[in-house]
């Protein structure tokens, strides 16, 4: 069974880390999923954020529903027909402190929770921008900047019971954006990624202190097919609640997704037409093609 590659960010992407950079490039191209260490996010902040998220989910339902927005993927998402065990909180732009303040205010979150969420969102935004830059550098694009790309922040809880063991928590899907950085539940596994070579799902077991990175659909399109958008799912493996925290780097600020010219040549002709990310997200919703199939509709 394939192992999830582990990348030390202190080595990857720099001039002296050619071997680690090559491993990063291979992980993105082959599996579309890897772990990162050397990320600089303090263990104490990770623990504080996990406690804050659990406190938010333990709020009464009426308080949680006050944080419901009309923007898809933002606000409170209650359990539904497709994923009855799953609920989430979303922040549409985690890079904007005002959005974080508004999110906490609608929940009447206490000051220490607000400060934890703000500090964590800031560190995670820096981390995902750094990871994206190193991924781009592994493809030879050393000047690419992702600082102003919108980011979505999502807190997830899976309300597992004994009856749900063995059932799906979230169905098979790809992420629609460029990259996802995920802090897993340190006690409960369940995340599985598809190994395209073997056609089998591989468990991503918890590893405290590390983050899991997934390549999404925009990552595959922007890289002209060099990066692999990983299919993944969440399975219930234990009758206990499972909490995870995700940061999504979505698409360029102007919403336009197009492979840079440096990644298009005679041997690598352009694979996808230029498209708007919001249009693509709506395409996924309207077609129900949420596991990367919708990209084929944008073939050049």
UniProtKB/Swiss-Prot annotation:
* Entry keyword Oxidoreductase: yes
Top-level enzyme category: oxidoreductase
* Superkingdom of source: Eukaryota
Q: Name one GO biological process term.
A: auxin catabolic process
Q: Which GO terms describe its molecular function?
A: 2-oxoglutarate-dependent dioxygenase activity; metal ion binding
Per the entry, what this protein does is: 2-oxoglutarate-dependent dioxygenase essential for auxin catabolism and maintenance of auxin homeostasis in reproductive organs. Catalyzes the irreversible oxidation of indole-3-acetic acid (IAA) to the biologically inactive 2-oxoindole-3-acetic acid (OxIAA).
Stated family: Belongs to the iron/ascorbate-dependent oxidoreductase family.
Q: What is the protein's given name? A: 2-oxoglutarate-dependent dioxygenase DAO
Give the source species: Oryza sativa subsp. japonica
